[in-house]
Every structure is written in structure tokens, then in C-alpha cells.
Amino acid sequence: MAEVLDLEIDPISDGEDDTYSSELDDDLKDSIEQLERVLCLVVFPLLGKFLGRKFAFHAWARWLERRRLVSN
């Protein structure tokens, strides 16, 4: 029973630790690239479309209001 409990665990060597860290860095870079793609291809265009329409609506309303004031 003592032999079963006396397991030797090899410490992670520096090379394996660097590989693990490198894999984490690669995964993080991939995740950031995916987030950038989603923002650039989906979020920013939709936000720009929404804000552009809001701005155009308010600009058109102000122009019509000024036109009515000048006409009267």
C-alpha cells in the first residue's frame, strides 16, 4: 500500500512550461483576432448604420424647421 501512495510526480520542466505558455499566448491571440473580426464586420457597421440614421433624422428635422421659419 505504501508503494501505491509513494508516487513520484515529475516537476514540469522549463521547456514544457514554455510550450504551455506559448500555447496559451497563441490561443489568446486567436481569441483577440476573432473579437476584432466580429467588431469590425458586425458591431461597428450596425452601430454606424444606427447612429447615421439618427443623425440624418435630426439633421433633416432641423433643416425643415429652419426652412419653415424662413418661409414664414
Swiss-Prot record:
GO terms for cellular component: MIM complex; mitochondrial outer membrane; mitochondrion. Residues 1-34 are cytoplasmic. Keywords: Membrane, Mitochondrion, Mitochondrion outer membrane, Protein transport, Transmembrane, Transmembrane helix, Transport. Coiled coil: none annotated. Induction: Differentially expressed during meiosis. Residues 1-22 are annotated as: Disordered. GO terms for biological process: mitochondrial outer membrane translocase complex assembly; protein insertion into mitochondrial outer membrane. It comes from the Eukaryota. It is found in: Mitochondrion outer membrane. Belongs to the MIM2 family. This is Mitochondrial import protein 2. It comes from Schizosaccharomyces pombe (strain 972 / ATCC 24843) (Fission yeast). The gene is mim2.
